[in-house]
Amino acid sequence: VNFIFNNLSHEEKVDFSCNNYPKKKNPGTAFVYHTSDTYLIGTSLNNLLSDKKENDFFDDLLVPIFNHHNFSDKIKYIRRTNDIRNQPYTGWGMFLQRDDLIKLNSLLQSSERIKYFSKEFLDEGLQRTEDKGLVAIKQSDIFYNNGFWAARFDKNIFGCKEDLMIPFMSGFGGITVVFLPNSMMYYYFSDNFTFSWYSAVYAAHNIKPLC
């Protein structure tokens, strides 16, 4: 099966990303997810930085944040194309330790996050605004907004005043990182295509109420 993972050079990846999924809907009207689209985002970011001192979004913008907050050395590496462009894969190819997830959750929960990231963009992704994003999986009440997935939980389950929108990140094969509204986090890394995590939400609520 031809997929963006099979293409090693920057030119091949851009060609695949642009030509294998023709546009069918107007932007912002229907949820469509392609991992290859994230590669185009990374390419666009580096193109925007090409005339600046910081010309690599990963090494020059993200790694300094990781350094400042004492993330592991593993997270400071990302897979890249095997050509002179040396383009970061962007949507995949990173490596994390468990402690990196804890530090990421702490950063996203703190006010310091707005020093590095757009407050509006991140608040939307973390379900802190009225903009809940687009429905991604209707039958499961799953949404997608600014790089984050979110699951809707009925307010009556936890005795809340409003339904809960719980943001999470999801990766191929069985990777889940859930950012709970009580500041707790749940993560599960596997390669057996297990994506069930709702029981962890109920357990977290018993430890510390979600609302």
Segments predicted by a language model, with ranges:
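Short alpha-helical interface patches
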Residues: 14-18, 98, 120-127
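Catalytic loop of the DD-peptidase/beta-lactamase superfamily, centered on the K-T-G motif
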Residues: 50-52, 67, 85-90, 109-211
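Alpha-helix initiation and capping sites
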Residues: 35, 55-59, 95-102, 115-119
